[in-house]
């Protein structure tokens, strides 16, 4: 499946410009796009319904717009549903969501990322790491904290445009690569 990245970029920017710029609206739209992507990829009945030539485009639009009304999603996104159905673009909703999230992070000056530790961290350590990285980047960070014992020690911070790796595993890999090159 080839994704038309330029079309996805245009649609995501169109959504960003039409939706209110508050955190709740942007996160609601992001969740809605994620829901559409999961439904299309993992739910065969939904995919069959959307791709069926026997179901009119109006019925498809009505169904997806009813999902918008049931959720707390801004009404400004309804034009997007029309374009999705008319151009049969539900297959690229995942790419549109990724680009939308990137654009909304820029608007809100927030980085969403993953903070991975080798063992369960102390709250003070997490706060200190986040505070120092926020100071360097001049942006707020909303990390999702997880544990991966394969790191041996240290942590990894993965943001959309940055990976900060202070784990023992990466140090050992770098040392191994240097020894191999000798």
UniProtKB/Swiss-Prot annotation:
Q: Write down any Gene Ontology CC term.
A: plasma membrane
Which InterPro entries would you find in this protein's record? ATP_synth_OSCP/delta_N_sf, ATPase_OSCP/dsu
Family label? Belongs to the ATPase delta chain family.
Q: Where mainly located?
A: membrane
The record's subunit annotation is: F-type ATPases have 2 components, F(1) - the catalytic core - and F(0) - the membrane proton channel. F(1) has five subunits: alpha(3), beta(3), gamma(1), delta(1), epsilon(1). F(0) has three main subunits: a(1), b(2) and c(10-14). The alpha and beta chains form an alternating ring which encloses part of the gamma chain. F(1) is attached to F(0) by a central stalk formed by the gamma and epsilon chains, while a peripheral stalk is formed by the delta and b chains.
Question: Where does the record place it?
Answer: Cell inner membrane
Q: Which keywords has UniProt assigned to this entry?
A: ATP synthesis, Cell inner membrane, Cell membrane, CF(1), Hydrogen ion transport, Ion transport, Membrane, Transport
NCBIfam families given in the database record = ATP_synt_delta
| GO terms assigned for molecular function | proton-transporting ATP synthase activity, rotational mechanism
Q: What lineage does the source organism belong to?
A: Bacteria, Pseudomonadati, Aquificota, Aquificia, Aquificales
What is the protein name stated in its UniProt record?
ATP synthase subunit delta
Keyword check for Cell membrane:
yes
Q: What does this protein do?
A: F(1)F(0) ATP synthase produces ATP from ADP in the presence of a proton or sodium gradient. F-type ATPases consist of two structural domains, F(1) containing the extramembraneous catalytic core and F(0) containing the membrane proton channel, linked together by a central stalk and a peripheral stalk. During catalysis, ATP synthesis in the catalytic domain of F(1) is coupled via a rotary mechanism of the central stalk subunits to proton translocation.
Looking up Pfam families in the UniProt record yields: OSCP (PF00213)
Q: Kindly give the membrane topology term recorded for this protein.
A: Peripheral membrane protein
């Amino acid at each position: 499946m080839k994704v038309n990245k330029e079309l996805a970029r245009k649609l995501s920017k169109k959504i960003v410009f039409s939706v209110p710029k508050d955190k709740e609206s942007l996160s609601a739209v992001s969740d809605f796009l994620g829901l559409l992507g999961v439904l299309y990829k993992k739910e065969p009945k939904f995919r069959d319904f959307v791709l069926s030539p026997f179901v009119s485009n109006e019925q498809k639009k009505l169904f997806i717009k009813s999902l918008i009304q049931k959720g707390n999603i801004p009404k400004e996104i309804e034009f997007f549903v029309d374009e999705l159905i008319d151009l049969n673009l539900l297959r690229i909703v995942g790419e549109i969501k990724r680009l939308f999230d990137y654009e909304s992070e820029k608007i809100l000056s927030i980085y969403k990322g993953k903070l991975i530790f080798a063992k369960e961290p102390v709250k003070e350590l997490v706060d200190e790491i986040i505070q120092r990285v926020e100071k360097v980047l001049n942006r707020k960070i909303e990390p999702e904290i997880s544990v991966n014992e394969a790191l041996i020690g240290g942590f990894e911070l993965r943001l959309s445009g940055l990976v900060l790796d202070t784990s023992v595993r990466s140090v050992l890999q770098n040392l191994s690569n240097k020894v191999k090159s000798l």
